[in-house]
Structure formats: structure tokens, C-alpha cells
């Protein structure tokens, strides 16, 4: 709950912004505690911003820890590197396919992502 409160107090979203994104990874808690705490955060953020948050996680983490159907309605940003296509068969919106990409004008390596949809679908995901 404190993390959700901190997020709400720190992040002001404007028209055209993507919904809040939560990077969820394994921590010391057991899977049931993790899922419970995650759902509390998601519900609080969704009530405040009136939009479903995006879950950013790895393909393996999603299949191991977020396999409960209560998480199926959330848009996913799946990190799955060094493969030709994302293996996750569920409803994913973004795929981060590398963390060592290159782009003109940027000296350091960068993350590269693909949106699973059209430009119009991407616009529909944004804050209105």
C-alpha cells in the first residue's frame, strides 16, 4: 500500500501518457504473498487513475508467478530476450526483445520494444 501511495503522490499522468507500468520481479515473499500484494497495488492504482496498469515482467516470471486468472485482464509488457518471437501465448501488449539495442544518436545500449497492435490501438491505451 505504501508503494502505491508513493506512486500516486509522485506520478501525475497527462492526456496521451501510457497507463502506469509496474515492473514486477521475484522478491523474498512466497508466491501467494506476492500475488496478494500485487493485486492490492493494482487495485489502488486503477481506482486512482481510472485505467488498468500495465504489468512489466519476464516471460518466465509471468508463467511461474502470475498464472492466476485474476491477472489475465491486465495488459502485459513482456521482457523476453534473444528469441525471434515472444513465446508468451497470453494477451501481451509490449515485448521488450533486447536490452542491448542500438539507435542513431544514442551512444549507450538501449532497450528495444515492440507494440502488439496498431497505432490506433496504442492511442486507445493512453490516458484520455
PLM feature spans:
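Functionally critical loop-and-helix segments that line ligand-binding/catalytic clefts
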Residues: 67, 71-128
